[in-house]
Amino acid sequence: MNLFLTKDGVLKLGYYGLTTQAECYSIKNWKCEGVRSFAPEVFKGEYEMKSDVWSLGTALLELMGITPYSDYDESELPTKSGVDESPYDKRDNDSEDMSSFIECCFDMEVDDRYNVDELLDVSVMGWRMMSSIHL
């Protein structure tokens, strides 16, 4: 997963090169880089806007030095990722605000997961997320 910053300062999530890689493999045998950031429903062949919220959460984990599902090989993830566990375990030094924000990204049930507008209302470290973030 990649974070892109447009010339207008808009932050966007993307999967650089994923399209060509994904065409080569079935969903059961994905060999794409970045599967650690996929939402659980993506492995079932489903995609919703809230799937990008999950990916945003994994990007934040990576920025914090946490590799999502680091105990698993990427080839195991299509059967393991998000089925019964969040990729985030709060560490002692993680701020309460940041932890709360990240946890909003990782609800296993898509219908219960925050959407982008709800995330923008979550206060993080005393400041509101900029409305220029587009998923």
Protein language model features and the residues they cover:
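Terminal C-lobe "cap" of eukaryotic-type protein kinase domains
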Residues: 107-132
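Conserved C-terminal C-lobe helix
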Residues: 93-106
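Conserved activation segment of eukaryotic-like protein kinases, specifically the C-terminal portion
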Residues: 28-41
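Conserved catalytic-loop aspartate of Hanks-type protein kinases
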Residues: 52
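Hydrophobic anchor on a C-lobe helix of Hanks-type protein kinase catalytic domains
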Residues: 63-64
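Activation segment
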Residues: 44-49
